[in-house]
Amino acid sequence: MKKLYLFLLVALCGAMINPAVAKKKNKKKASTEATTKKKEKKETKYDKLFKGKKVTTAKGFITLHQFDNKVYFELPLKVLNRDILLGSTIAETTDNQFGCVGEKSSDPFLIRFVQRDSTITLRRVQAGQFSDDREIKKRLQSSTMPAIAETFEIKAYNNDSTAVVFDMTSYLLSDKKMLSPFSPYSLIEMMGANIDKNFEKESSFIQGIKGFEDNVSVRSLLTYKVSVGAKGGYAVKNMPFSAVMNRSFILLPEKPMRHRYADPRIGIFEHSIVEFASEGRGLRTRHIAHRWNLEPSDSAAYLRGELVEPKKPIVFYIDDAFPLSWNKYIHKGVEVWQKAFEKIGFKNAIIAKDFPKNDPNFDPENIKYSCIRYAPSTVANAMGPSWIDPRSGEIINASVTVYHNIVQLVQYWRFLQTAPADKEVRDVVLREDLLGDCIAYVLSHEVGHTLSLMHNMAGSSSIPVESLRDPKFTQEYGTTYSIMDYARNNYIAQPGDKEKGVRMTPPELGAYDYYAISWLYKPIFEAKTSEEEIPILDKWISEKSGDPKYRYGKQQFKRRFDPSSVEEDLGDDPVKASEYGRRNLQYILKHINEWVADKDKDFEFRTALYDEVVYGYVRYLSFVLADIGGIYLNERYDGDQRPSYQTVSKEQQKKALNFLLNELKDLSWLDANETLKEFPIRTSVAMQMENAIIDGILSRCGAVSICSDKATSAPYTQKEYLADIERFVWAPTRAGKTLTDTEMRLQMNYLTKLIEGSVTGVAKNATRKGITDMYGIIEIPEWLKAASRERFGIVSEEFMGCFNNKHAEMQAARLEEISGFEDGVDLKAPLEPMEHVYFGELKKIRSLVAASASTGSADTQRHYRLLLYKIDQALK
């Protein structure tokens, strides 16, 4: 009974305990149980992957993890199968002869990350084919599936299973051609040298990572042993070489920009895609223009005619490594293009900014940022490539690289081309503002390329030569209708012209430049598709087709048919322009010592300038030579006012020939004995130029043949051309005169070329060159090219066209050029039998020489006997 009482008492007391205290005890118990369970939770693969590691993490659209010289990608599942642009940029280098900071070894390319079971595959995406037909599109997708370039094992899912983690190190620390540190624009590549390289993985490292909302980047330090081949061995053998490469992964929009179809009648960079049409048209090649995605921020205001800023302006960041004095001129070279965009309603469409000082997110090697980069290189060059979204042609990134030695080259240009008329440039170093204008010109030309404008070599070809000595005309138009032409400075202007107000330099922008920007970037609101834009774009070009200011002339490389599309020339008449140019060169040689002798004690400047005088003379002669057998070429659509081609008139061709032949009469000014007598000793340039001119004249026979075949009236035939040369060459012999040394050399050169063009006797074994070579120009002497390379580095054909300074063995072979969107045209000389003509000429010359063998001086007679011997040997 007592025990029962105690039990009931305890129970009653328990029932009377405070409910809040009881609740607290229950919570404590539950918390203890939860903690125990938490301790018991297993570590995930994701946790184990990074456990105990010193991990650096960068969060962007992909999260990057760096540790133990490895880089892991944490790729969200929602990013799988998305289009990503991958590009590689040189950030640092131990030797910029293999590539300069800021250069990219290849165009960025499209990739996708695709999951396959327990792996992630990196796939290369093809964007070169399309169809609007649903069924064809399905088959195209299965026929052009993205190729697997690399496979990675999935190491883990993140803890909420929204992303996969895999090791990308093997891809980013390897020798991949598309991600290489060896630039195709490098000095070594331009020399045509063979590069043997061995990648050294054990000496290569992951150096850094960055992540942003729409892009991530990885820096890889790559190390090689490099050997550079030279004749008979190696110039460099197993040299250590390292470069830091910045690899950018950019997430492209799911919906590409609406593309604009290109037109071959205007010089815009483009790429081609193949359309599989369903309307019975079969395959159709379409050309997609490259352009920035400029859209008005306020469409209503834009349509009212107000100036409107774009949603996303074009921004160029200027390298802080440039000499400080260049900075404002670089800004000017970029922002001068604002004028062209303002004409089509955009305000502040293109902006130049200095490298940010306190922005941790800014990275000039990140492909997201477009930059003007400085390269401390001996090369005298600048370039402005751009990189695109291949799905739409949208320009994603563009960078201008300016090589330091360009300032040397532009100073020589300015002096050479304008010193006779402009006293201010008669100095060994240009005044800062004059040099600044030269820098701004180079920058504006290269920025034009980044905006997608190609070279327009016909920019000055319709300007009357005399207009280039007219103050009113030159102040309005400068030297050309397009700064995308290679029309440098006003070499037409004569002493006294500047005082009259004649402009010495190109315009800031030309009429064609405004027109090209308008065609490429003006919004077409009324068109809902790219196809609907075509009639409007076509009209914009067709309505300008009768105005020569807006003519587009393609840059010609190996084959040069069109004399109006030649680098460095000015004006509509090469003969008259070159006459003015030659007078100015003679004026320079006559006065150079009085202008700069006190500042050029070691003759370095004057020696270099003399070489540039010879180079300039070769250019002027070549402009004239191009008229012989020349054909003006135009891309034409039905209804356009210009013809597709038009031959140079017989009168102009004969005028050009007479100019060149008359130049041969007196080239002694090139040796300028009074000027050069204190210079280091050198061989006679006049004699070398004699040979080059006659070689050039005779090399145009094939071009004359094509031109006469295409002429609609009064053709200048190859027979007439040879007859005109023959009359000039043998005129002193017919007159019974004593021959000068020049006349004897001319006759010997002519006879040698004539023999090479025949198939008789010893000529059967001769190399059939010269008289049957229709693509010749006045050859630049190899010693002159060598001196130029020593002074300016290798200046390639992309910067100087056919007047580049590459050695003959460095010249890259080009594919046959065709019309349309390609570089030029491919024409074959008509199969007109000419051997009998050459044979007849040899017989006629033999008769003339035999009849004149006893005339003239003893030297002249010995010369005739040698000619007779050579002819008889050829006719055996």
Residue ranges and their predicted role:
Residues 460-876:
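Conserved catalytic/binding loops enriched for acidic/polar residues
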Residues 354-375, 437-494:
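The catalytic-center signature of Zn2+-dependent metalloproteases
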Residues 80, 325-349:
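Zn2+-dependent metallopeptidase catalytic core
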Residues 335-346, 448-449, 453, 489, ...:
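Sec-exported extracytoplasmic/periplasmic mature domains
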Residues 313-314, 346-349, 394, 481:
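Loop/turn elements at helix/coil->beta-strand transitions in domains of secreted/extracellular proteins
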